[in-house]
Amino acid sequence: MVNMKASMFLTFAGLVLLFVVCYASESEEKEFPKEMLSSIFAVDNDFKQEERDCAGYMRECKEKLRCSGYVCSSRWKWCVLPAPWRR
């Protein structure tokens, strides 16, 4: 069972690597690998937690209504409880 999981993981990783190498070889840009890695690991401003106004737990974030103890989820635009992984 473990060997099958490991072989499937290695097969999948090999296919992903093959895709990346083929795509990079077709690209005419010399800086492609660097650009690709920077785009994969770049943090977009949309994913950063923002302090916004909110109306209450699991409610849509509003600009005019404020509530303490909640933060606005950047993904769903709902008011949620603050947690360490959301900071």
From Swiss-Prot:
As one GO molecular function, the record gives:
ion channel inhibitor activity
Tissue spec. comment: Expressed by the venom gland.
Q: Which residues form the propeptide?
A: 25-52
Q: Name one Pfam family in it.
A: Toxin_12
Q: Which residues form a coiled coil?
A: none
Q: Where in the cell is it found?
A: Secreted
What's the domain of life for this entry?
A: Eukaryota
What keywords does the record list, in alphabetical order? Answer: Disulfide bond, Ion channel impairing toxin, Knottin, Secreted, Signal, Toxin
- Spell out the GO cellular component terms annotated for this protein, sorted alphabetically and separated by semicolons: extracellular region
State the signal peptide span.
1-24
Cysteine disulfide partners in this protein? 54-67, 61-72
Q: Does the keyword Amino-acid biosynthesis apply?
A: no
What's said on domains?
A: The presence of a 'disulfide through disulfide knot' structurally defines this protein as a knottin.
Described by its record, this protein's role is as follows: Ion channel inhibitor.
Report the family membership: Belongs to the neurotoxin 10 (Hwtx-1) family. 51 (Hntx-8) subfamily. Hntx-8 sub-subfamily.
Under what name is this protein listed?
U3-theraphotoxin-Hhn1o
Please give the organism.
Cyriopagopus hainanus (Chinese bird spider)
